[in-house]
């Protein structure tokens, strides 16, 4: 590489090499090179400055631009050099513009046109001091154009360029392996610091902005005026006559469109959201008046009943506040896939889209059928994304040979399925759901071969299903000696709790291609090592193993996590997420993009609120307007660097106002102090930047060469620190500091596989920060909440993406017992987090977590505790009907109006939420019903099980929820297995029905006057019964009868409670009847 007498150095901000004029002679030559040149924008000759030097707009590449175009570019344009994309700095004599000395996040998107990875501050620092050694000795004396062969794992290659480096680990037997710079030729790596289309003149692009049309017309008019002057003076240099044609180039709008933001926020219309906010404030005021009345008007003859109801109502009010205020700023988002393609997919050039590693996790193939997992994998392999940018990793935590064989057959079928999907652009790309959808598949399909190929593909898929089902039938009968491979070798996973790690690459760089001869995405089977005596941390541990394996084998900068039963329903889902992740303006602080969960196979009425529409269409939109949605465990695209525990890019404070904006007396008072602070800050920044020179061969400071021994010492210390944080794999540590991902192309596959086996060993995480600060966080069965919470505490923000076509679809529990079991697991995880050090009530202060976001996390861990007041409150109607008492005294006109306003505000709040959230009343009502059902059953049991697990150490083991499409074989099993979950709500139903019968009977026997007080108690009891109605329907099931054991236990418990209440009656005054003098003399 010809350096032209200039020094090679590195920019840590852009991760690129630049040329620095190291001596005066070289600087003079570089200036002379510009002499006589014309501005590459307008064609004018570049003028001289007041010091008789040629005007240079960009100090990085010296691209010829005249001062008028430079000032116009800074004032009206994108403020960046057209060639190297470096932001123009203010030159003495030029006016200030908005954005001077501001943070990189606010700079126009041209500067980071190809920089789609994050640049965390201390990640660059780690890359400086530990991953790259600056080199010594013979390197200094090497000629500028010499190629320097360096080791790549196990072999050497001298054909790679020395001006592109990757982090390579040479073989070493000593402690503390060193990391040296080595050439890097990965074609998937995005080009750094170069023009998008070098062969085109810069004038063809114009000036891009959001309002393109207006600003383009102004620019063309001004350019036309300049060209007329040039023509008149004869100074067009042969270019002037063609500029108008270039300005009218039809490709110009396309190129400018590619520079626009890739997404935008769509706030809820003010006509919908403002009344909603006003009503929330009114409801708060009504709530205050309500509690003022309730506290000041006790029920004297049933004081205990009144006090219990007030305590429950206060808890409900606090719970409502925690749930309501995170929905204060709901937003929606819109993506521009065409702009993403224009920006990163140039015709005739390699795709610039970032690679993505997809994680699929499964445990038990008998409860998570292999056919469902196979459909998920097929939908991933057929995704609309460059095949060399996608790698699918399937984690088999059960080490089942059934899963291994099914995945092998899936890889073979993918050779036919993937080209069929891409040829005809079908949706969805999971064959089971594509062939089962009821639609006219001939609609909009004009390809003459489509019908023929579709029928052939359906036959092939039916044969594939037969093979998978045959494997499942065979796996039902396990041999006594265990399974063996085809060559007679025992299957390593015969013992599920004691087996080595296993990795198998089915597709990818092994030479296997589809039927059309095209390359297929990589498909890797992973089963981590398990040994007795090690805590494997269930799903969270499996996901962390996938992070490390993928970092060694492919190291994509972004990760997609899906459950085995959630297939990709929208083939452009990954592109949708990249519109946020790769957006140069706002993408650098995004840690993950969460998609809503949508489900197949749910009945039309959705009696158990399986769709959870209120949460995904209302609550998550509200969180997206604050700091982003919480992570829900599937359908989420992560930034790898965020999972590594790095902090989000810090936002610098904007500079203070200049003297032109402040009064002169203020400048006299504050100018000196501000100047001194600025100097100190600049000195500190310069010192910090000097310590971050990643590719520097030597530090240059005023012509003095500083040896690099101190840098080496810091590198060794940082290397040890990184190994303590990430583990003892030098290859993984090297990959962890690569911000844009990638692995060395010439690395030996055998070496990579050996390293991958090491990082999934059961003892790899010992004495590291895995599960504590890195990856999926341990400590709860709901690791998703903890993982997202830690990222938000590090200052990251997340994004909620709701494309018109659902990105992912999955299967939901189909019967009541499965649904309650699922809710039980979620609630248990929340209780574990509440009782841990990561509880959002006291953890994460001083970080980047916003207050309303903290409210949401607090609500997500506190809601199981609501089961206690909820069950008590649902029991009060029966108590009131049995005792003839009530929770409120005789209602006055004021109290009646207050209660009416309270109920109206609750109803109208729900209506307005449904309006701006796009939720139907059926979904909203089912959500309200299941809140009571889940609170009275699963949440209560989760609360006690969580307390036993955390405080007493009694562990509760759960089985995976069945994902089978047919529930006939499992329905009865689950009903009898989870009997205890059904008893509390059944008991509430029975005692309230008994209370209604007793209350009505008492009113009939006591006459007309007793009907008035009875209405309030009946309304209270019927409110509970109506909310529990889906539970009653669910217990009847297909047999239209309730299991006998449930009926017996519930009636027995209800009878005991009723008799005990009649005997004790604690809410009635203990004294006898109050005798008063009536005023009549009865003795006479």
Curated annotation (Swiss-Prot):
Highest taxon listed in the record's lineage: Eukaryota
Topology of this chain in the membrane: Multi-pass membrane protein
UniProt entry tagged with the keyword Coiled coil: yes
Extracellular-side segments: 300-301, 889-893, 951-979, 1033-1041
Annotated positions binding UDP-alpha-D-glucose: 361, 367-368, 397, 538
Keyword Zinc-finger belongs to the record: yes
Cofactor note text: Binds 2 Zn(2+) ions per subunit.
Tissue and organ expression note: Strongly and ubiquitously expressed. Localized in some dividing and expanding cells, as well as in vascular tissues.
Cofactor(s) essential for the protein: Mn(2+); Zn(2+)
UniProt-listed Gene3D superfamilies: Spore Coat Polysaccharide Biosynthesis Protein SpsA, Chain A, Zinc/RING finger domain, C3HC4 (zinc finger)
InterPro entries: Cellulose_synth, CES_Znf_RING, Nucleotide-diphossugar_trans, Znf_RING, Znf_RING/FYVE/PHD
Subunit structure: Homodimer. Interaction through zinc finger domain.
PANTHER family: X-BOX TRANSCRIPTION FACTOR-RELATED
Function: Catalytic subunit of cellulose synthase terminal complexes ('rosettes'), required for beta-1,4-glucan microfibril crystallization, a major mechanism of the cell wall formation. Involved in the primary cell wall formation.
The protein's name: Cellulose synthase A catalytic subunit 2 [UDP-forming]
Species of the source: Arabidopsis thaliana (Mouse-ear cress)
Gene: CESA2
